[in-house]
Amino acid sequence: EIMPSLVGSEMCIRDRSKGRYHIVSSEQMKKRPMKDLLVSLEKLGAHIEYDENEYHFPFTIGNTGEYADTVDINVDKSSQFLSALLISAIVMEKNFTINVTGTHGMAYVEMTRLMMKQFGLDVMQDKKNNSFIIPKKAAYESLDYDIEPDVSAACYFYAMSPLLHVKSKVMGVHQNSLQGDVAFLDVLADMGCTISDEADGIVCMPPKNAHIHGGSWDLSTFSDQALTLAAIAPFANAPVGIEGISHIRLQECDRINAIEENLTELGVRVEEIENGLKIYPAERIKPCKIKTYDD
């Protein structure tokens, strides 16, 4: 029995093994949409028996003994599905092709591809046909590897810089990071901060005039920072548009709704736009209890 955290690649590998594995999860993970990945695994030869709701945890996974060498995957709900297939493709016995539909989160997929290359596995990418090819008998090489700091978490500290008008530095974070969330620093620069990449980490200095600039940004390639930007948006001198984030409704909770509800409780004016939110400057912030939605 397995309790998953980042379960996608784990399931793909189990699909190719000879055993049967029962995978359970937290109540919150049971709500996460998994259908696109699980359908792809079934087409690759997985046999899945669901304990409760179809295409959701918990379930038992084994294999039918029949294997395909091509699979289609849609990434509109989560790019993790594609990353899982890429990472685990080395267990396939033939050249393996993954055909991709959708464009969400491809910066995270590129991070996966580059890390695989660092471990000696160069995934071929056919951009014309939007597919990835992993050669048969591919294997990872062992090596000593320095893991980058979590840029998603680092962004919280960088966001404090314009709010508190202080210098913020996170050790080990650099502009050449594989992680797409490093693009959030470009947003802070647009808002008036000064960003400098020093030898031991990136420094964020607050706006010189203490004014945080408003504007509109497409966060489709680093959507984890939508909540971070939403938290500082009420303190900007003009409205802040957060675009390209419609897919975050399908994560551990409806994160667009979570942003809107909590900011409204704080006295902030928020409007839903086609694929995101517009947040207006707040004259004052009202005390309230912040709902976390078990996220």
List where the protein language model places each region.
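Short, recurring structural edge motifs at helix starts
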Residues: 26-29, 71-74, 100-103, 144-146, ...
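Internal metal/ion-chelating core segments
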Residues: 75-163
